[in-house]
């Protein structure tokens, strides 16, 4: 348990908790100001301790994973930023197809492990630079597959109850009300610490590895992997494709400061070396306004904004 100054000092000395840490190193866009407090817990118990401490101190808590779907303001974030990328590890049963992974486990790592064991269902995830926790919260997906297709449950901590509840809770797939790039976890007090999946066992491992390699090759040749980005910026407004709408307006290569609409894939905004969060935000707004004006279609961002006066 977290006990006053002694517990705080222990977390500071161990490096789990730090002050005034630039968050640009914690996002795939490589932008973002400092966190007032940044914590990288190693397990669920430390998560609980940190949440209890933040609540006692009256600090706002925000949870991030790999930072692959975030735009953090240049001014940074007040309160406690809880980064779960150290919560890594997974258990895969080749016979039953049951999989459990901690929230910070990288999706590509889990996808490759599953393929090597002949477990089918996560091949689409090999090129997504996110974590299991983030994928569970936003229903990450690609190439016709999505997290909701194979996730059976998530283990969560209710941030609003950390002063009375000292354990985690299990929520089923149905509880999460999955939709396209959405779940009830978004905007809630539920913090994912682990997820459970049901994959299909008994598939040919070599064939699955070939498929994952092919999926990764396709993504690296059709998307701008050489520049920092958040992945796809906008949801596809079915039946249209966001990238095609943006490209159709001649917006590829449009630039504000160090932020640029990728010339490789128009639904990517890349940091070409010196972008700020304000540059990226302004370019997102410009693209949205142009598509709305010319096509009458509203593009909704997949990316979550933190630290701005208004958020998505």
UniProtKB/Swiss-Prot annotation:
Pfam families: FAD_binding_4, MurB_C
Cofactor dependency: FAD
Pathway: Cell wall biogenesis; peptidoglycan biosynthesis
The entry's keywords: Cell cycle, Cell division, Cell shape, Cell wall biogenesis/degradation, Cytoplasm, FAD, Flavoprotein, NADP, Oxidoreductase, Peptidoglycan synthesis
Domain FAD-binding PCMH-type: 30-202
InterPro entries assigned: FAD-bd_PCMH (IPR016166), FAD-bd_PCMH-like_sf (IPR036318), FAD-bd_PCMH_sub1 (IPR016167), FAD-bd_PCMH_sub2 (IPR016169), MurB (IPR003170), MurB_C (IPR011601), MurB_C_sf (IPR036635), Oxid_FAD_bind_N (IPR006094)
Catalytic site: 181, 232 (proton donor), 302
NCBIfam families the record matches: murB, PRK13905.1
Protein name as it appears in the record: UDP-N-acetylenolpyruvoylglucosamine reductase
Primary gene name: murB
């Amino acid at each position: 348990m977290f006990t006053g100054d002694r517990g705080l000092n222990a977390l500071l000395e161990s490096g789990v908790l730090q002050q005034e840490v630039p968050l640009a190193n914690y996002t795939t866009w490589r932008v973002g100001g400092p966190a007032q407090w940044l914590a990288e817990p190693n397990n669920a118990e430390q998560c609980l301790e940190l949440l209890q401490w933040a609540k006692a101190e009256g600090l706002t808590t925000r949870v991030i994973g790999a930072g692959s779907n975030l735009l953090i303001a240049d001014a940074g974030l007040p309160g406690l930023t809880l980064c779960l990328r150290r919560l890594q590890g997974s258990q895969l049963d080749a016979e039953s197809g049951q999989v459990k992974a901690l929230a910070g486990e990288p999706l590509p790592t889990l996808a490759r492990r599953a393929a090597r064991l002949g477990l089918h269902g996560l091949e689409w995830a090999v090129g997504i630079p996110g974590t299991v926790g983030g994928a569970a919260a936003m229903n990450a997906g690609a190439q016709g597959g999505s997290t909701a297709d194979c996730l059976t449950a998530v283990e969560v901590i209710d941030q609003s109850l950390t002063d009375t509840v000292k354990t985690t809770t299990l929520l089923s797939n149905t509880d999460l009300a999955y939709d396209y790039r959405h779940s009830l976890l978004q905007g809630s007090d539920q913090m994912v610490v682990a997820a459970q999946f049901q994959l299909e066992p008994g598939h040919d491992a070599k064939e699955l590895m070939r498929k994952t390699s092919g999926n990764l090759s396709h993504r690296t040749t059709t998307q701008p992997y050489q520049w920092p980005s958040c992945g796809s910026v906008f949801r596809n407004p079915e039946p249209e494709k966001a990238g095609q709408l943006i490209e159709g307006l001649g917006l590829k290569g449009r630039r504000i400061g160090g932020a640029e609409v990728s010339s490789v894939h128009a639904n990517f905004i890349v940091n070409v070396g010196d972008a700020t969060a304000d540059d990226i935000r302004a370019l997102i707004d410009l693209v949205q306004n142009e598509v709305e004006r010319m096509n009458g279609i509203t593009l909704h961002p997949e990316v979550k904004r933190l630290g701005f006066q208004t958020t998505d």
